[in-house]
Each structure stands twice: as structure tokens, then as C-alpha cells.
Design a protein with these regions (language model features):
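PRPP-associated nucleotide enzymes
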Residues: 1-318
Length: 318
């Protein structure tokens, strides 16, 4: 890490993931910026930077889960930073909400992922840093630079010691490229689950393409929400004779009873990142958290020094 000359660097945290921001600042050995946030009786959000940011390189860390309030807070932070004459303002969005609304797949629906990109730019973002977007084409929705990080180093390092007799599973066709990159990195086989989704947050496992009998299985995905699809995949793999079953998922939304579903499933361990805070896990939980702080910290300091970020990720996306 090149930590020299960070005098113009300032990192501020929104309210959605203060813990991750603290870890980023600790990694970089910089003090977290001071900011005031108030919620008025009618729900309006008020933001004030408590230190001078004129001419500074400002990074605002805020995941947008749940999206409505946290996105609005980020927009207000961006506007306040721009109006305070920051030299450059970067929105660091560990989890980019609305990413699943990335295309017009039905009549009379919005492409909300594009809308969010537009309003972030309009609010004052000069650049965006995010991780494992649900759809790669979202990168093209922005008219400003976007650094797209990958959580894969967190998990491939973990599974270097567990790769014997391992196959990597993509839970759908859309994730096959990232699953293939894991498989190549771990020298493992590749399996695809063919599924259809009759309704939102519901998926029916249709067919498993590949051999899992007697194999250790690693399911990789960008997010886990209600866990219904994930648990169904675990069950289907187990019925086909899979031995140990692991998961590596970047964004742990874990809505509703998702944690209970995971704990009661046949999975051995589910690894997730801290792009979304998880504070209610039991000590012996099957869900294991891997911090993404170093990846975000390195991307911030390299961005600050105008250095390459792609070298952080030796990932084959072909």
C-alpha cells in the first residue's frame, strides 16, 4: 500500500455501514472524517461536514441497503460535498442497491439501476467505487468513471486449502463467467444450475448441468436475499450426492427469515462479505463474514494516487 501523501484524502461514512468505514480507515491509517447527521420529525435527512473539505479528495462510504433512506442520505452527502468545494468526490458504494432492476424485461417498467446512476452523477459524484454489481452492463450506465471491484480474492484465498475434489457451481446462467473464473483459479470443475423464476424472490431449480456426486461443492453468487433460491440449490445438490457444500456470496441481504433458512439447510459453511452489516449472527453460525475493507482501502488509496486498480484482481472474466 502506498500510504504516502494522504494529506488531501478524506473519508466520511454514511450511516449504513460505519463498521466497514472504520476498518477502511484503520487499514489506511487515516482518521475518519467528521460529519453530522440528523433526522427531522418528518423523516427528512440533514447532513453537515464538520471540517473543511475545500480542495480535498473526498470519499463517501455508503451502502444502499435498505435502498430508499440510505440512497437519499448518500445523495445529500454528495450534494453537500460538492457545494463545499471538494476537489473530487467519490461515492464508495459497497453494495449498489437497485442493481437487479438493470433492464426493461417487462412492459412499462423502469430501468432503476440506470436511474440511480444518473442521480448519483447529478448529485455531484465525480467517480464511483463499488463491488460485484449484479449485472456487468450497469458499468455502462455511468457517464463518470466507475471502479468495479471483485470480492473473489476474499474467497479464493479461503478455498485454496479446501480445493481438493472441489467443483464450483453457478446458480444461474448469468453467473457462469464469474463461476468459471473461480473454477480456473481453484483448478476445479464447473457446474451450472438451470432455473426459472416464476415470481420475484422465487426460483425453481430445473436442472443441474455437471457432476456433483461425491464432490465438495462451492456455490458462488453476487448476492443472497431471501435465501429461497440458494437453499433450493443446496438441497438439489445434496440429493445428487454432493459431499460438503459451501457458499461464497458477496452481498448478504438476508431478508426476512433468510438466516434461519441458511442455518437449517444442508450447507456446511456460507462465506459472505461485510458490504452489508450483519450484527445478529450466532457465534456458531454457518455464516462466516470476510471483510472487504482491504480491497476498498486499496482501491481508495490507488484512486487517490491515480494508480492502477485492476492489478488488485487477477480474475479471468472470459
Amino acid at each position: 500500500m502506498n500510504s504516502s501523501d494522504v494529506s488531501e484524502l478524506l473519508i466520511f461514512s454514511g450511516s449504513s455501514n460505519v463498521g466497514l468505514t472504520d476498518k477502511i480507515c484503520q487499514y489506511l491509517n487515516v482518521k475518519k472524517g467528521l460529519i453530522s447527521r440528523k433526522i427531522f420529525s418528518d423523516g427528512e435527512i440533514w447532513i453537515k461536514f464538520k471540517e473543511n473539505i475545500r480542495g480535498r479528495d473526498v470519499y463517501l462510504v455508503q451502502s444502499t441497503m435498505p435502498p430508499a433512506e440510505n440512497l437519499m442520505e448518500l445523495l445529500i452527502m454528495l450534494d453537500a460535498a460538492k457545494r463545499s468545494s471538494a476537489r473530487r468526490v467519490t461515492a464508495v458504494i459497497p453494495y449498489y442497491g437497485y442493481a437487479r432492476q438493470d433492464r426493461k424485461d417487462q412492459p412499462r417498467v423502469a430501468v432503476t439501476a440506470k436511474l440511480v446512476a444518473d442521480i448519483l452523477t447529478k448529485a455531484g459524484a465525480d467517480k464511483v467505487i463499488t463491488m460485484d454489481l449484479h449485472a456487468a452492463q450497469i458499468q455502462g450506465f455511468f457517464d463518470i468513471p466507475l471502479d468495479h471491484l471483485y470480492a473473489s480474492p476474499l474467497y479464493t484465498d479461503e478455498f485454496e486449502n479446501k480445493k481438493e475434489n472441489l467443483v464450483v457451481v453457478s446458480p444461474d446462467v448469468g453467473g457462469i463467467k464469474i463461476a468459471r473464473s473461480y473454477a480456473r483459479k481453484l483448478d476445479a470443475g464447473l457446474v451450472l444450475i438451470d432455473k426459472r423464476r416464476p415470481e420475484h424472490n422465487q426460483a425453481e431449480v430445473m436442472n443441474i448441468i455437471g457432476d456433483v456426486e461425491g464432490k465438495n461443492v462451492l456455490i458462488v453468487d453476487d448476492l443472497i436475499d431471501t435465501a429461497g433460491t440458494f437453499v433450493a440449490a443446496v438441497s438439489a445438490l445434496k440429493k445428487l450426492g454432493a459431499d460438503k457444500i459451501y457458499g461464497a456470496v458477496t452481498h448478504a441481504l438476508l431478508s426476512g427469515n433468510a438466516i434461519e433458512r441458511v442455518e437449517n439447510s444442508a450447507i456446511d459453511e456460507l462465506y459472505v462479505s461485510d458490504t452489508i452489516p450483519l450484527n445478529n449472527l450466532a457465534p456458531n453460525s454457518k455464516i462466516k463474514i470476510k471483510t472487504s475493507a482491504a480491497l476498498f482501502a486499496e482501491s481508495i488509496i490507488r484512486s487517490h494516487h491515480s494508480e492502477s486498480i485492476s492489478s488488485l484482481f487477477e480474475i479471468d472474466k472470459s
